[in-house]
Each structure stands twice: as structure tokens, then as C-alpha cells.
């Protein structure tokens, strides 16, 4: 995957995240802070690259799938950075979520991003029912005890 391809993927995902998260309260601000932080979006790039091989998946479905995987990844990073885990103070070139906001807000933010990842898949009119089930299963496996 080229850097320009990843940059295009990132732009699509960040536009979708911006739509999903209008800045209306403290938790959403914290969600935006981490979800829209500078990142390579490699996971999203893998979704787009594999999806582009399958012409039965629409571009909009790929955007929703890629967005959900990035939201799930961001949730995992926020929780990983917590004082009770790795206690990292920096993430993606900026203060970790629990440093910028506080530990309780970071926990709620991560939880909300995880829920939004699932909600985004389930709510997408572009993703077929079979694709929704397999996507939710893959996300659950990745963030659960199998991941």
C-alpha cells in the first residue's frame, strides 16, 4: 500500500468520523480528539485494498467498514494508554486521552467508540445483512478474548 493510497483512505474515514461525531459534548469532544488524531489508517487501508478486489462491495460500504475498524482500534489505544494498563502519556503525537481529559472520561470515550464501531456497521444501508454479521463477528473477535 502506498502512502498516497493510505492518505486517500484516511481522508474518507476521517470525513465519515466527522459526520458521525458532531462536537456536541465532552465525551464526543474526547472521541473526536483521539479518533481524528494523526494516524496512518493502515487497518482502513487493508479494508479498502481487500474490498477493491471484490466488486460486490460498494465504496460507501467500504468507508463504513473502514471507519468502524479505525474506531475500534482507537478505543483499544485509549484503554491501553490508561494508568492501569501501559500508562502512556502520548499517543499519535499528542497527549493521551486520559492526560488531555481525565481517566474516567477516557474510559467512557473508549467504551463509546467501541459501541459506535458496531452501531456504524449495523446502521449502514450500504452493507448487506451477511456482511454486517461477518463484520460484527470480526470486530467482536478482534476486541474480545480472541484478539
Which residues make up each language-model segment?
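Secretory-pathway/luminal and periplasmic proteins that interact with or process carbohydrate-rich
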Residues: 74-77, 145-147
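Multi-pass membrane catalytic core of lipid/isoprenoid biosynthesis enzymes
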Residues: 99-119
